[in-house]
């Protein structure tokens, strides 16, 4: 699933191609995504130019004078910039053709993605209204995590993956951040100290920054706006390394299921 670094990579990649470019046509080949693609999408987009490409959590927001286009990539979706005369491939469900002769194309094999239209303020939309802070926002601190976790018995890994606490920390990056902070993923969130939460908040920012700089993580099917894979998988310290030696102590990395997700950690370095 594309997580925050992958979505941010795509945001940065498509921005120069779509900002201030008038939409000249919209083609919806498959409207049945996670939610139906609006039947009036063409009327909302054609003739208008996008004024920006923003990201909120794992949602892309493309505002124009009439409203805002919301795109979510779901489990396996990708956005690419292609010449407008490029024939569609399998699972190319939505095309947004631009006056430049380029097209923003959504490919989504599993159809868990979304293309929606927002007429009001995006921050008031049901999908966005209850999200926590961005991990790079000033309000995301160890003190905030400590305060929100008091009395919580759930695993700290599940706690930091809760989008109401902080957005964009998916399974891969949660495992990596907890390892760097030296915190066992199964430790109860309410039993993590203020000092260790400060280390975790910094580790989250460091891991996400490194992943964005590497263009995201390719495990199955993530590619950027030009179809290139992300390379952060080459820098993973624990995720996907079950049985391999810890890079710090040499003990084999373990994998356990936490909250129905595979979680990787070192039993010596993480407490």
UniProtKB/Swiss-Prot annotation:
GO terms for biological process: base-excision repair. Keywords: DNA damage, DNA repair, DNA-binding, Glycosidase, Hydrolase, Lyase, Metal-binding, Multifunctional enzyme, Zinc, Zinc-finger. The active site is at residues 2-3, 58, 261. The keyword DNA-binding applies. InterPro entries: DNA_glyclase/AP_lyase_DNA-bd (IPR015886), DNA_glyclase_Znf_dom_DNA_BS (IPR015887), Formamido-pyr_DNA_Glyclase (IPR020629), FPG_cat (IPR012319), MutM-like_N-ter (IPR035937), Ribosomal_uS13-like_H2TH (IPR010979), Znf_DNA_glyclase/AP_lyase (IPR000214), Znf_FPG/IleRS (IPR010663). Its EC number is 3.2.2.23, 4.2.99.18. It catalyses: Hydrolysis of DNA containing ring-opened 7-methylguanine residues, releasing 2,6-diamino-4-hydroxy-5-(N-methyl)formamidopyrimidine; 2'-deoxyribonucleotide-(2'-deoxyribose 5'-phosphate)-2'-deoxyribonucleotide-DNA = a 3'-end 2'-deoxyribonucleotide-(2,3-dehydro-2,3-deoxyribose 5'-phosphate)-DNA + a 5'-end 5'-phospho-2'-deoxyribonucleoside-DNA + H(+). Pfam families: Fapy_DNA_glyco (PF01149), H2TH (PF06831), zf-FPG_IleRS (PF06827). Binds 1 zinc ion per subunit. Its cofactor is Zn(2+). A zinc finger (FPG-type) spans 237-271. It comes from the Bacteria. Involved in base excision repair of DNA damaged by oxidation or by mutagenic agents. Acts as a DNA glycosylase that recognizes and removes damaged bases. Has a preference for oxidized purines, such as 7,8-dihydro-8-oxoguanine (8-oxoG). Has AP (apurinic/apyrimidinic) lyase activity and introduces nicks in the DNA strand. Cleaves the DNA backbone by beta-delta elimination to generate a single-strand break at the site of the removed base with both 3'- and 5'-phosphates. Monomer. This is Formamidopyrimidine-DNA glycosylase. The gene is mutM.
